[in-house]
């Protein structure tokens, strides 16, 4: 997370200069790319900038992303969803309640996300979490090949719609790698990186 003072300065800059492209950059950096950010406040800033920059397409995109993040922010309950995994079986939010769940995005072109997948698979095999992967590749066959190559055991979803998939929007997942952690039906963490996952694995092995 970003130091609170930096976030405070960024907010003040946006309020003082809603017409500036720098304000758009700061909002993206300190709210969309910052886990645990105040998405409600970010939306207020985006609305302020939109009044001064009505034709800015980036702001429209930020607003859309923030609405999704707000609905699936830390402390909120896991939004309802239904999807099919790559074996054609239904994956429903209602079936995931009361467990520790990690839902993670990945892609064939993102080494970091593949590294995260392998760490998540270890957690899954040790029974520490139920993991669901969402592949954002356009080629479902390529995604299946990678799962088989890396011997990934947990369920994966790949609808071929890349970052425009419905499930990504429902869960507020907008980058690769990205993830949410759900405990007892509530979102408790976002964007846990591979090194943190490995540390947790090391702690389990002690």
Where are these regions (language model features)?
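Conserved redox-active cysteine motifs that mediate thiol-disulfide chemistry
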Residues: 97-119
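Active-site acidic short loop of glycosyltransferases
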Residues: 19-20, 97-99, 173-176
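Hydrophobic beta-strand anchors of alpha/beta hydrolase catalytic cores
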Residues: 102-103, 131, 179
């Amino acid at each position: 997370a970003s130091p609170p003072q930096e976030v405070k300065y960024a907010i003040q800059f946006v309020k003082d200069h809603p017409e500036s492209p720098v304000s758009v950059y700061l909002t993206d950096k300190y709210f969309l790319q910052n886990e645990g950010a105040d998405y409600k406040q970010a939306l207020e800033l985006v609305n302020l900038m939109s009044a001064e920059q009505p034709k800015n397409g980036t702001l429209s995109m930020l607003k859309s992303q923030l609405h999704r993040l707000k609905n699936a922010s830390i402390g909120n309950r896991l939004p309802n969803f239904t999807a099919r995994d790559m074996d054609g079986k239904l994956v429903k939010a209602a079936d995931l309640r009361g467990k520790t769940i990690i839902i993670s995005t990945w892609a064939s072109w993102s080494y970091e996300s593949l590294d995260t997948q392998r760490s998540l698979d270890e957690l899954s095999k040790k029974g520490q979490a139920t993991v669901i992967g969402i592949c954002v590749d356009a080629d479902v066959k390529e995604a299946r090949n990678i799962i088989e190559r890396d011997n990934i055991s947990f369920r994966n979803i790949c609808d071929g719609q890349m970052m425009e998939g419905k499930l990504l929007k429902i869960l507020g997942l907008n980058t690769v790698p990205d993830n949410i952690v759900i405990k007892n039906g509530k979102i408790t963490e976002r964007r846990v990186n591979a090194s943190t996952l490995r540390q947790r694995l090391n702690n389990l092995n002690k």
